[in-house]
Amino acid sequence: MGSVLYSLSESANLYPASELFLRHRLQIVEELWESVLRQECGQNMVDLLRQLRDLCSPEGQATKDQAVSAVKLIEQLNINEAIRAARAFALYFQLINIIEQEYEQRQQLTRYSDLEAETAPLNGSENITSSSNHNEDDVIFNRGLGTDFLGKNWTNRGQGKQKGTFAALFPLLSKLNVPPQQIQRLISQLDVRLVFTAHPTEIVRHTIRDKQRQVVDLLQQLDEVENRAKDGGGYPWEAGEIREKLLEEIRLWWRTDELHQFKPTVLDEVDYALHYFQEVLFDGIPQLYKRFKYALNQTFSWLEPPSKDFCSFGSWVGSDRDGNPSVTPEITWQTACYQRKMVLERYIKSVTQLIELLSISMHWSDVLPDLLESLELDQSQLSEVYDALALRYRQEPYRLKLAYVLKRLENTRDRNLALYKGETPTNEDSPMYRSGSEFLAELRLIQHNLTETGLSCRELDNLICQVEIFDFNLTKLDIRQESTRHSDALNEILDYLQLLPQPYNDLSEEQRVAWLTTELQTRRPLISSELPFSDKTNDVIKTFRVVRSLQQEFGINICQTYIISMCRQVSDVLEVLLLAKEARLFDPAIAVGTIQVVPLFETVEDLQRSRSVMRQLFELPLYRALLAGGYKNTEVKVPNTELTPQSPAPSPQSVLTPDLQEVMLGYSDSNKDSGFLSSNWEIHKAQKSLQQIAEEYGVNLRIFHGRGGSVGRGGGPAHEAILAQPGHSINGRIKITEQGEVLASKYSLLDLALYNLETITTAVIQASLLRTGFDDIEPWNEIMEELAARSRQHYRGLIYEQPDFIDFFHQVTPIEEISQLQISSRPARRPSGKKDLSSLRAIPWVFSWTQTRFLLPSWYGVGTALQEFFNEEPEEHLKLMRYFYVKWPFFKMVISKVEMTLAKVDMQMAGHYVQELSDPEDKPRFEKVFEQIANEYYLTRDLVLKITDHGRLLDGDPVLQRSVQLRNGTIVPLGFIQVSLLKRLRQSKNNTATSGVIHSRYSKGELLRGALLTINGIAAGMRNTG
C-alpha cells in the first residue's frame, strides 16, 4: 500500500532491535488493514485510500494544491464510499494505537529487568535541594538537545521512563545523600490517590474495546511464537495461523458499529470505569507494592515500606452530579452496591482457588489452637456448611475454614444484591461479613497459622493485600456539586421556614457567614423528614442523606469527600457543612464530622481568591476544630448556646485525617477562561500560596489536581507535571483525576498500568524530597507574572472581545455535531439555555478545536507574550528563556506541552475548515479571525523553537515526533472527508445542489452518521477528545 510508514521504511539496518520490532509490527498491521479493506470493500477502496494519503506529506501539512486534489477525489464519492473511507482511516488509527501500546508494554518489561544492573539519575534531578549537603555540580545535567537520533534507543521517552521507576529513584536518593529519616517520614505518609471520572467518557464503544483486546492478545501470542521460532522451537505454521486469526478478528471489528447506538446511562459509565479494575488494577496494585518494597530494600534495607494502600483509587462515576441531572441519590447508592458486587465476586473467586490450593492435612502438618477454635465457632453459626463438608474436609482444616469464609462471602454478596435492587435483604440473620476488616481478620488467621507452621502461600498474601487496598468498596466515591445548588436550596428552605427577614440569596457574604456560623453551633434541625420543597432542593437534601446511608451501610470510607465546584467564597463551604449537619454528618456541639468539604477553585479569579477564602476558613474556630477532629483536640472553647442540648445524642466518630485540608484546583475552566499560560501560572501560584497558608495555621494540605486528558485541560505526561509542581505543596500527598478518555491508554495493559502508577509515585517522592528552589526566585516569578498577564490579555482579546469569534467557533468547528455524539450521560452545556462560551463546558470546547486541528486552547497567547518580552531586550531575554527552559521544571513543562501541541496543529487543514464551512456572507469576517489565529501560531512556533534550540518541533523527543507524523499524514484526508460531510449536512435543509461536497441522494441522518464517524476517527488519530 502507499507508504504508510514513510521514513520508517528507510535504512532499517541502522535501527536498534527495539525499533525493528516496532517496524515489523507496523508492517503486519499495514498488511492486515489492507487485506481487510480489500475483502470488505474491494480493491477500488484500497486504491482510493492510497491516492488520498499519497496527496499528503508525512508531516501532515496539506498544501493548497494537495487540498484541491483531495477534495476533487472526495467530491466523487457517494455517502457509502465516504463512510467507508472514514471508517477505514479510523480503524487504521486504532490499530496504530494498539501497536504503540503493545510496544511500550514490551519496552517496560525489558527496561524494568535491566534496571537492577544499571540505574541513572532522574530527569529534573539537577540543582535540587534537600536538607542533606551535596554539590550542585555532582549532578550531571544533560539537555539532550541536537543529539543524533540514530545513536539512541528508538524512544528518547523510553530513557525518561526508565528513570521513573522505584529501582532508579532510591539509588538516586542515596547518591544525593538524602537523609534516610526524611525518606522514612515521607514514605510513612505517602498518599497517592487517582480518581476515575466519566467526563469525557471514552469515545470508543465498550464492544470495540473488547475487539481491541482480542487483537492485543493475538499480537502477544504472535510475539511468543516468533520468539520461539528464533530459538529454533515451535512450528512454522503457528505464526501464519495467528495472522489468520488476526485477520478474522479485524474483519469482525470492521462489521461492528463504532458509534454508540444510545446515550449511555450513568450505570453504563460505572461499568465501563470498573472494567479496568476487573481486568488490570485489582491484580496489578499488589504488584506495585511489591515493586516498591523490593526496590526500597535494595538501597535502604533498614527502612519500612509504606502501607499497602499508599496508592489508592477514587471515583466520580456515579457520584459526580455537577451539571449531570442523571446522577441521582439512587444512582449513587446503586454505584456503591455495584462496586461492592464486583469486589466480592473477585474475593469469592480467590477463596475458591485457595480451597483447591490449601490441601494441607493434619496428618502431616500442625494446626494452631486459634484456628481450631474458630472452626468450632463457624460450626455453630454455619451448620449447613459443616454438615455438607465436614466429612470431606475432616483432616483438612484450611479447606474447611475457607469453606466457611466462602459461605459468609456469598451471604454478603446476596445481601448486597438485594440492596442494589432496592429490596429489603431476606438473609439479615445469616452469618456474613459486615466489613472488609472482618474478612481480613479471617484471612490473617489462616496466614498466621501457615507462617507458624513453616508455610507460606503467595495467593493468600496477594488476597490479603487486595483486601487491605480495596476493602469491600473497591474505590471511594467523591460527591461533587456546583456551589449555587446549595445556596439556592438553603434559600428555599429558609424562605419556607421564614427564619430570615429577607431571602438568603439577597444577603451579603458577611451576613451569610455570620448566620451560617451561628447556625453551625447548634444541633437544632432545620429540615424535617418530609421534604415540601422543589425537586432540585429535595435532590440536594437527599444527596446528603444518601451519603449518611452509605456510610452506615458501607463504612465511612466509602464516601467522605464532598467537592464544591465553582467555589468562590467562605459561605460556599459553610453551606455544605450546614447541609451535612442536617444529615447528621457533622455534629456542631463537638465539631466532629465524617465528611470532608473540599473547595474546588476553577476560574482565574477564584484561583487568585483561594488564599483569602482558606485563610478566612482557618480563622473560624468551628472549622479549625472540625479539621482537628473535634473541640477536644483544640484549644478552642466549646460553644455553649441555649440551643445546644446538655446531653447530646450519639455523635459521629471522626475518621478524617487530623488537620488535613484537601483543596481542588481546576485546569479546564481556568484554561478556557484565560488561556494555557495564564491558567498554568495561576494554578502554580495558588499551590504555593495555599501551602503557605496551611503551614501558617498548622494544617496539612492535599492538592487535588483536576487534570483533563488533553493539554488544554491540564493533560500531558504526569511525571513531568508533578516534578514541575512547587515541592512544598506535595509533601508526599497528591490526588489527580484520571479522565475517562485516557483510561484505555493507561490501564488496558498490566505493565503500562504499573508503569503509569510507578512514575506518578516516584514523581511525588522526588518532588517532595528533591526541590529545585527555582519556584522561590522572586525575579523569575515576576517575569512569569508578566508573561502570564500578557498571554491572558491576548487570549481574551480573541475569545471574549473579538465580536466575530463566537460565530466563527460555531460555524468552523463541529461543536453542534459533537453534542450529538452518544458518548456521555452529561450534557455538553451547562443548563443556562444559552449558546455562548460561558455555558459551554470545557470538554466539548477543547474537543472541537482538536477536531479542526487548531488545538487553540493549548497555545494561543503564548507567542505574543514571549514576543513582547523579547522585544524589550532581544538577546538577553532569549538567553533567559533558554535558561528557564533548562533549569526551571515548571517553565520546561509549560514550553514542552506547548511544543507538543503545536506539532499536532495543522494550520493549512484548519484553514480548509474556515474556507469550506463559513457561510458566504461571513467568510470575509472569519478570514480575518483565522489570519489572527494563524499569525499567532507561526509566531508561537518560531519562538518555541528558539527557546528549545530545536530545528523542528519535538526534535527533543523523536518517538513522539514520529508518532505525530505517522498520524498527521492520515488525519488530513480524514479531515477533508469530515469537512465535506459537515458542509452538506449543514446545508441539507436546502434542496439545491451544493458544489464542493459529496454528491449523492442521502438523508440528513446518513450525513450525520458519516460526520460522527469522522469525529471518531480524528479523535483516535489525535489520541484524545476533550
Swiss-Prot record:
Residues annotated as the enzyme's active site: 199, 672
E.C. designation(s): 4.1.1.31
GO MF annotations, alphabetized: magnesium ion binding; phosphoenolpyruvate carboxylase activity
Any GO BP: carbon fixation
Pfam family, any one: PEPcase
Top-level taxon: Bacteria
First-tier enzyme category under EC: lyase
Ranges in coiled-coil conformation: none
Cofactor(s) of this protein: Mg(2+)
InterPro entries: PEP_COase, PEP_COase_bac/pln-type, PEP_COase_Lys_AS, PEPCASE_His_AS, Pyrv/PenolPyrv_kinase-like_dom
Keywords: Carbon dioxide fixation, Lyase, Magnesium
GO cellular component: cytosol
PROSITE patterns, sorted: PEPCASE_1, PEPCASE_2
Catalyzed reactions per annotation: oxaloacetate + phosphate = phosphoenolpyruvate + hydrogencarbonate
Family that this chain belongs to: Belongs to the PEPCase type 1 family.
Reported function: Forms oxaloacetate, a four-carbon dicarboxylic acid source for the tricarboxylic acid cycle.
Name of the protein in its database record: Phosphoenolpyruvate carboxylase
Source species of the chain: Nostoc sp. (strain PCC 7120 / SAG 25.82 / UTEX 2576)
Gene, per the UniProt record: ppc
